[in-house]
């Protein structure tokens, strides 16, 4: 196993270029299964979740070829099976997107569900299954999710999501792209990566309207053709580096972003006293004075993203006064708080809220990454803390952040990756 050694207490200066969006890539790669042709996907992030999904596609019979570091060519014309390897599926939570893609193209799917599906007291797959069933599929749940269409193709249907679910919205879109008839998703999620998936599918010949609103209409077509598509920049990666500047101080130019996607994060950081200047596809982020307190509530897009909750919590630990962070998406996303208190943070969790009393500084400690975004928060805390910290279980961080060590070093951070023997049980979120 690997851990990070971080010498903290130094401001960050320089430029960071944002990679392709992880949350878009992990849906668009499975969506390539719907294409009866060769698709070229550009701006793919070099992260372990992407590697795992591409291996799954190869196991199913796809031909996968990297053209360069961030562009990949996928040929799904000769898929040999609709059964996904249990060993491969367990490596990535987003393997459930394979169900919608395989159902949409072949009318059947068998996918072993990853262990992260039941965290926080909620079963996120429920809304996916509801949509598949409405479209005529029989779905059996056990060690595997086995789904089969009633006939050769899925049937268009009206689907109302009981809760706003990004995963269900995207999975139903994929299942409906080649369906017989029109599918309407109501109470749909609106995140940028949902729009990106719809744009990818439309570029390959799908007919999807309304992505980015709460009602999406998918008019089923007979076939999708090959093409070229570039994934959007990663909103959460950009926000993570912005939060790091807030916590550590300094000045960083964040390049290759879509400013509109950053509005909710930018506004909250500005409330805290961070200066953010927008120009074209860049944000100049500066923090020199003391951070101000604020309150944050995570909500579905365009609200403040739940995947940024741990990172901004770290910055608020160093703000003057009392801040309250409320988690409005997941039932339980505060397991990392215990790690921050070991570094001197003053936080108490009350239900869905964390009450934060700002402190002058954090102190170095050995901490663990319990999930992807909390792991990023631990790195930020270690960068801001006085002394040398160790962050373990960093393989979860590498699920969603391309070359985080190299990018932070380019900003002047003193951070190294070393091998170790110890591992800790974790959960996958984000």
Over which residues does each language-model region extend?
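Short, structured segments at the rim of ligand-binding sites
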Residues: 1-430
């Amino acid at each position: 196993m690997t851990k990070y050694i971080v010498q903290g207490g130094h401001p960050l200066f320089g430029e960071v270029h944002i990679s392709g969006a992880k949350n878009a890539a992990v849906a668009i790669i499975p969506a390539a299964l719907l294409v009866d042709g060769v698709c070229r996907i550009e701006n793919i992030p070099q992260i372990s979740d992407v590697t795992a999904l591409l291996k799954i596609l190869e196991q199913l019979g796809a031909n996968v070829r990297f053209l360069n570091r961030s562009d990949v060519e996928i040929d799904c014309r000769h898929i040999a099976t609709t059964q996904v390897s249990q060993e491969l599926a367990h490596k990535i939570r987003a393997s459930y997107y394979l169900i919608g893609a395989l159902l949409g193209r072949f009318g059947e799917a068998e996918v072993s569900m990853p262990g992260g599906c039941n965290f926080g007291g909620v079963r996120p797959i429920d809304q996916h299954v509801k949509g598949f069933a409405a479209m005529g599929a029989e779905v059996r749940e056990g060690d595997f999710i086995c789904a089969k269409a009633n006939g050769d193709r899925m049937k268009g249907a009206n689907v109302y999501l009981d809760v706003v679910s990004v995963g269900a919205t995207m999975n139903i879109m994929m299942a409906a792209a080649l369906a017989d008839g029109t599918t309407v998703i109501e109470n749909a999620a609106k995140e940028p990566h949902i729009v990106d998936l719809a744009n990818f599918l439309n570029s390959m010949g799908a007919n999807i309207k309304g992505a980015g609103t709460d009602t999406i209409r998918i008019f089923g077509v007979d076939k999708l053709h090959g093409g070229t598509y570039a994934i959007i920049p990663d909103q959460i990666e950009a926000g993570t580096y912005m939060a790091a500047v807030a916590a550590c101080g300094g000045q960083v130019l964040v390049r290759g972003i879509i400013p509109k996607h950053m509005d909710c994060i930018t506004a909250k950081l500005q409330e805290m006293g961070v200066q953010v200047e927008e120009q074209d596809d860049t944000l100049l982020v500066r923090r020199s004075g003391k951070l101000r307190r604020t309150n944050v509530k995570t909500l579905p897009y365009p609200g403040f993203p739940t995947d940024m909750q741990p990172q901004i919590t770290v910055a608020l630990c160093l703000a003057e006064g009392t801040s309250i962070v409320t988690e409005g998406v997941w039932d339980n996303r505060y397991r990392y708080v215990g790690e921050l208190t070991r570094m001197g943070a003053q936080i108490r969790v009350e239900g869905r809220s964390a009450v934060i009393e700002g402190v002058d500084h954090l102190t170095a400690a050995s901490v663990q990454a319990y999930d992807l975004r909390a792991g990023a928060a631990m790195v930020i805390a270690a960068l801001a803390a006085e002394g040398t910290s160790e962050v373990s279980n960093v393989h979860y961080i590498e699920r969603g952040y391309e070359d985080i060590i190299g990018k932070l070093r380019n900003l002047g951070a003193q951070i190294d990756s070393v091998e170790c023997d110890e591992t800790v049980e974790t959960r996958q979120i984000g």
